[in-house]
Amino acid sequence: MSKEKIIGIDLGTTNSCVAVMEGGDPVVIQNSEGARTTPSIVAFTAKGETIVGQFAKNQAITNAVNTIRSAKRFIGRRFNEAGDESKMVSYKVIRAGNDGVKFETVSGEFTPQEIAARVLQKMKKTAEDFLGHEVKKAVVTVPAYFNDEQRQATKDAGRIAGLEVERIINEPTAAALAYGFDKKKTNAKIAVYDLGGGTFDVSILELGDGVFEVKSTNGDTHLGGDDFDNVVMQWMIDEFKKQTGIDISGDKNTVQRLKEAAEKAKIELSGTSSTQINLPFITADASGPKHLDMTLTKAKFDEITRSLVERTRIPCINALKDAGLSASEIDEVILVGGSIRIPAVQALVKEIFGKEPNKSVNPDEVVAVGAAIQGGVLAGDVTDVLLLDVTPLSLGIETLGGVMTKLIERNTTIPTRKSQVFSTAADNQTTVSVHVLQGEREMASANRTLGRFDLVGIPSAPRGVPQIEVTFDIDANGIVHVSAKDLGTGKEQKIRIESSSGLSEEEIKKMVKDAEAHAEEDKKLREAADTKNELEAIVYQLEKTIGESADKLDESEKQRAQDEIKRGREAMESGDLERMKASRDSIQQVAMQIGQKIYSQAGPEQGAPGAEAGAGASQGASGTDANGEKVVDADYTVVDEDKK
């Protein structure tokens, strides 16, 4: 019996595509309508029918409120993140119970995952008709800058569609895999510029001897062809209002007509200098019906969309920087996604990388082809290819002083596993709270919360004694798992970051931009937090030493120590960096003198004070558990384990 096939699916914002390995080569499969790509559109009718693909697109104008397109732009996102996006679609976007997103239709309410599942089912059926047997497994692609929640939501969509998603891979990585599949002996550095219907990614890879290694990735999860269409549509609305005084943006069916006309105009302007937009009977007033008839030139199109094209520049520059390469060191630039046909986009790519982009791949199919190749690797049909991808954003936890302690840096090769050992920050602490974060900023509050959980039942002990190992594990799909384990008792708590919401493109872009713009500010905040942590630790230790060794010290020594402790606490309350540094240094001198005196009296068999693990290290953030007990994350020492 032959091996089970693992198909490759490009689940796109505008169109989707499916491919499979046949006879050692990837084959793009035609759907039942005879097309190699399928519109990612799902429609619901009053009769209870569900229509997917081209037929759904055909009836969109007459059934706009029940036709869901571009659902990928909502997947894994919170309702409050979708405000601007929801205003630009013809269907109704509502809040789900978990603060996620749902679409309201005549057939009921549906999540973005459910809509994506309908498209995946169409892809599954297309493959089954071609292969002549049932398909159960697939590799599904996502934008490289999709966060954990969006990846998990995509995997959930596959499960809803009846597919085991064997691997989630990044779209530009899949494109590179397809480009280099027949060039495995070639050693090259390539950039993949992927501007699709709803997302933009750029990845830098090294190819050689069948190894496809991603060096860096960057992007914008809310930038694509839809945005170009929306700009053109808004221009049409504004122009019509100037001509007639009528605002036609309020009617859903009219908006759908405008959207389709804008997309058509955009496509035509990739090959002509102007296009005529004609929509008869677009609206009516007391004087009778009104028709929309206007000309859009390529020059005007370039003018109104220039800011969108420019938004792709900084991610390209940052990707090169993270990869440690200059533009001149890139051998090939591969263009992916339907929106790369826009001449201004191609011109910008040439300007950034200093060379003509490579147009040898089909931008609509190459991602599905790469997914099929990866499916062949997983099925054992392809044996001479190794894919090494990366995680796009840093991951860590909050530690004392509101600091983000990164366990996994962005652009780390996945799968990976890293651990750090923490301890308690208070005597008799029985619970440790773990606040999981994603982002590039130094301070926790400037990053995004992915989840929180508590490890309870820690035996009462002095601060610094319990050993709590926190482990981050990112699998090959880029999905995050976090655990905390008390090494003393073996008690463990785990969390998988759930897919109730996702990052908007603005948030991700802002994370990296803010990290660069506020680098100096973050450095000062981090230094203040670390200094306060050090001061708190040494105050605690000196106070403990005095209490335990009072009989070995005279009154003047004890009084001097108490005065230093008081000044240290006052410095911590002030938050002034220089004052805390001075107090820390002064207390260290006093503590050293007292320690030497106690040690000289005690003899060599006893250890010097301040020897317990973790003293003076960064510590965790405070809170309370369900019983009102103090919960504080604490000290750490680094224990890295890389599973590449």
Curated annotation (Swiss-Prot):
Single GO MF annotation: ATP-dependent protein folding chaperone
Assigned keywords, A-Z: ATP-binding, Chaperone, Nucleotide-binding, Phosphoprotein, Stress response
Feature: compositional bias, Basic and acidic residues: 550-584
Low complexity bias: start-end ranges: 600-623
SUPFAM superfamilies, A to Z: Actin-like ATPase domain (SSF53067), Heat shock protein 70kD (HSP70), C-terminal subdomain (SSF100934), Heat shock protein 70kD (HSP70), peptide-binding domain (SSF100920)
Induction notes from the record: By stress conditions e.g. heat shock.
InterPro entries cross-referenced by the UniProt entry: ATPase_NBD, Chaperone_DnaK, Heat_shock_70_CS, HSP70_C_sf, HSP70_peptide-bd_sf, Hsp_70_fam
Chain spans, region Disordered: 550-586, 599-644
Keyword Nucleotide-binding carried by entry: yes
Function: Acts as a chaperone.
Family membership: Belongs to the heat shock protein 70 family.
Entry protein name: Chaperone protein DnaK
Organism this protein belongs to: Leptospira biflexa serovar Patoc (strain Patoc 1 / ATCC 23582 / Paris)
